[in-house]
């Protein structure tokens, strides 16, 4: 496989390349992830840079990790599953709702043309923006705000990925999809959700596919939950 873009790397990133390979082969490929672009991007992006320093030794393990503000960086497999379900293409413009530490946006940015990502916690948004600059991932735009409202001035999008659990599919986000566009979101209660792929049909309707049960922190916003409890 060839890298699509060269990422800014530090020595510690190269030293942990073996851990990334093990993560990809043992956690992703063994569970059915097949998209070459997703696999290559997750081999490239230094996941450990997106977790707090005191947790970096666990960055490539099979599970989520706390990143502050009551939020988490998702399990590697779930990140791969959601991005693969988005069916990303090199020319795509993608919106992410729930930046967190920025890992999923970073993985997406190595695959698609441009990523717009919204985070409701300013501290996380600022941290992600700084990290993107450090890694020279210059095709990611970060905003602080209510992600359930989307990014109207940048719409429509080829894909939208929601990295928090919603009580229902946010209709505003569906309206910001291009015809043929895909939205991937966990939908359900505050404990368990069903991971859904919503595709906007050419006639304006929507087709929904279920991928399985997941657990995400709540999507808080006007078209989400009104609090986290």
Curated annotation (Swiss-Prot):
EC number: 2.1.1.77
Recorded GO MF terms: protein-L-isoaspartate (D-aspartate) O-methyltransferase activity
Domain of life the protein comes from: Bacteria
Active site location: 74
SUPFAM superfamilies: S-adenosyl-L-methionine-dependent methyltransferases
PROSITE patterns the UniProt entry points to: PCMT
One cellular component term from this protein's GO annotations in UniProt: cytoplasm
Record keywords, A-Z: Cytoplasm, Methyltransferase, S-adenosyl-L-methionine, Transferase
Substrates-to-products reaction catalysed: [protein]-L-isoaspartate + S-adenosyl-L-methionine = [protein]-L-isoaspartate alpha-methyl ester + S-adenosyl-L-homocysteine
Subcellular location: Cytoplasm
GO BP annotations listed: methylation; protein modification process; protein repair
Role: Catalyzes the methyl esterification of L-isoaspartyl residues in peptides and proteins that result from spontaneous decomposition of normal L-aspartyl and L-asparaginyl residues. It plays a role in the repair and/or degradation of damaged proteins.
Homology family: Belongs to the methyltransferase superfamily. L-isoaspartyl/D-aspartyl protein methyltransferase family.
The protein, known as: Protein-L-isoaspartate O-methyltransferase
The species this protein was found in: Pelotomaculum thermopropionicum (strain DSM 13744 / JCM 10971 / SI)
Underlying gene: pcm
């Amino acid at each position: 496989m060839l890298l699509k873009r060269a990422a800014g790397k530090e020595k510690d990133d190269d030293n942990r390349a073996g851990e990334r390979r093990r993560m990809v082969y043992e956690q992703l490929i063994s569970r059915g992830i097949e998209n070459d672009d997703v696999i290559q991007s997750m081999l490239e992006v230094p996941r450990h840079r997106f977790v707090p320093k005191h947790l970096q030794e666990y960055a490539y393990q099979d599970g989520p990790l706390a990143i502050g503000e009551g939020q988490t960086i998702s399990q590697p497999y779930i990140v791969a599953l959601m991005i693969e379900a988005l069916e990303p293409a090199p020319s795509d413009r993608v919106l992410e709702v729930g930046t967190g530490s920025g890992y999923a946006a970073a993985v997406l940015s190595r695959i698609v043309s441009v990523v717009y990502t919204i985070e409701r916690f300013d501290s996380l948004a600022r941290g992600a923006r700084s990290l993107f600059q450090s890694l020279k991932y210059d095709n990611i735009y970060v905003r602080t705000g209510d992600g359930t409202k989307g990014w109207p001035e940048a719409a429509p999008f080829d894909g939208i990925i929601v990295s928090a659990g919603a009580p229902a599919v946010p209709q505003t986000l569906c309206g910001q999809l291009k015809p043929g566009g895909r939205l991937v979101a966990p939908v359900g209660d505050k404990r368990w959700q069903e991971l859904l792929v919503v595709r906007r049909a050419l006639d304006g309707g929507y087709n929904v596919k279920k991928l399985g049960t997941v657990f995400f922190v709540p999507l808080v916003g006007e078209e989400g939950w009104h609090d986290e409890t």
